[in-house]
UniProtKB/Swiss-Prot annotation:
It catalyses: L-lysyl-[protein] + 3 S-adenosyl-L-methionine = N(6),N(6),N(6)-trimethyl-L-lysyl-[protein] + 3 S-adenosyl-L-homocysteine + 3 H(+). It is found in: Cytoplasm. One of its GO terms (molecular function) is protein-lysine N-methyltransferase activity. It comes from Streptococcus pneumoniae (strain 70585). It is an enzyme of class 2 (transferase). S-adenosyl-L-methionine binds at residues 157, 178, 200, 243. It comes from the Bacteria. Belongs to the methyltransferase superfamily. PrmA family. This is Ribosomal protein L11 methyltransferase.
Amino acid sequence: METWQELKVTVKREGEELVSNLLIELGAQGVAIEDSLDYVGNVDRFGEIFPEVEQQEEIVVTAYYPDTVDVTVVEVDLQARISELTDFMDLGEVKMGTTALAEEDWADNWKKYYEPARITHDLTIVPSWTDYEATAGEKIIKLDPGMAFGTGTHPTTKMSLFALEQVLRGGETVLDVGTGSGVLSIASSLLGAKEIFAYDLDDVAVRVAQENIELNPGMENIHVAAGDLLKGVEIEADVIVANILADILIHLTEDAYRLVKDEGYLIMSGIIKDKWDMVRQSAESAGFFLETHMIQGEWNACVFKKTKDISGVIGG
């Protein structure tokens, strides 16, 4: 019987997606997240701030490797990669531990962490293997969390989904920059966008996004391609959404302003508290006006608008 190895990495919550992605890059066949916080308060109107909730600082990212992989080498490589990123994000004291599993344990273990999750008023994320009956008006996003890039329930993703739900009215062109799992593209299609163009620099992300899109019927209007932010893109959009690190977002804003139509929106998430002012200044310098600022814990998300009428924007 083939055996598997379970590598558990304890890290600050801010590092969930980063560590998950690094583990996949280092050969993990699946990842699972243990998090004490899986909650966002209801938002009744656009622009309302999410409530603070009591939470533990650390989460556990569990990665699964076949026994042919030397996990001690993975641990060394992971620690080295994390050390290179300490200037961008405080991951706290990173702790690691390994356990051997039988094949049937692997098949069951990682799935137990994932259940259907109602993320916004309209959107529910459902693991691909789960039978789920939607209620009236509920829109279902099927994802395979074992493919990497998390489950779509991370605070940065949740706030991105809230923002999309509020700005999309139907018929828009959307650019999804750093698509990852493809969850924001799928949501955009469900919320009525006419065409969605999704880009990611990572070939793994491009493949994963395409596979997740194929789990959801009627997604022929989503086009996935490799791309470095918006370099070389000439498609004008009503909405651009990017859930990536703040230090990367600041290199996006000028191209975003060039491509967003008048009265269009730039949604940005993945911004830790200490980087918020930097991102805001970058967007405003490009010509955008801040319409909405959302906060959950250490995370910030925002909606900027390209407009000449500033009466409805913050400070207008």
